[in-house]
Amino acid sequence: MELIIMSGRSGSGKSVALRALEDLGYYCVDNIPLALIPQLTDYLEKLKRSVVVSLDVRNLPEDPDVLEQVLHAFPSHISKTLIFLDCQRKALVRRYSDSRRLHPLSTHDLSLENVIDLENHLLEPLFQHADYIIDTTYFSSHELAEKLRELLNGSSEKELNIIVESFGFKYGIPADADYVFDVRFLPNPHWNLELRPMTGLEKPVIDFLENQSEVHQFISHTCNYLEVWLPLLEQNNRSYLTIAIGCTGGKHRSVFVAEKLARYIESKGKKVRVRHCSLEKHYKTS
């Protein structure tokens, strides 16, 4: 099991970091008391989940020895990593000024600069135990997310989850579609009485469409389009991309083309899922 403890200066980007790690599949818990972390890891270990816990200055024990004991109490089979987000004071002051949020320690009768210095002192034991220290002073949110992905995965590229779906225009365009391709101009198996009851998943329909040059040409051009633009979409920090292929009823052509495009994307090493939005409607009415 992997346990990542995320801490750092207030305003250094811990919330951004948690969102980025959640996108990577980690179970994230914000501001958990230090004493509860062992109980949480025991529970999640049974579920085979890796976890990220965020610690801020309010959840730390006053005695540094207690922190030391907790950090060294985890069993050896738990892979523990402590990441500390650092940031220069002038950048923290600017961020708090821009956001107009209160610092967690602002109840003290101190200026913001003095509160930041106090927090630095209180966080020093965590800083000393950190496996990785990331200075976020000049990072944008995207750059921090990329840094974390590079640190944990060995690559700054975010994995893009791609969904290829077929649909029928008669039922409406799927609301979640990022790209919509219209294949109603392709030869239609519907006009073949033997093929009409079948779907684009069945061999006679597949054979029919495989023999149409227009179908191959469309798939080839669409694959070329995706090959050019998918890398740029991945660099844009997207988590999901939905490609919708539509024909009249969502039964033959769109189903066949969606399957072909999904296999092509999969052959490029991408994570892809296929769903056929309108087939269920046909099964219900048949």
UniProtKB/Swiss-Prot annotation:
Classification via Gene3D superfamilies: P-loop containing nucleotide triphosphate hydrolases (3.40.50.300)
Keyword Lyase recorded: no
Keywords: ATP-binding, GTP-binding, Nucleotide-binding
GO molecular function: ATP binding; GTP binding
Protein residues bound to GTP: 56-59
Residues that coordinate or bind ATP: 8-15
Keyword Iron-sulfur found: no
PANTHER family listed in its UniProt record: RNASE ADAPTER PROTEIN RAPZ
HAMAP family, alphabetized: RapZ_like (MF_00636)
The family this protein is said to belong to: Belongs to the RapZ-like family.
Name of protein: Nucleotide-binding protein HAPS_0087
Lineage, top ranks: Bacteria, Pseudomonadati, Pseudomonadota, Gammaproteobacteria, Pasteurellales
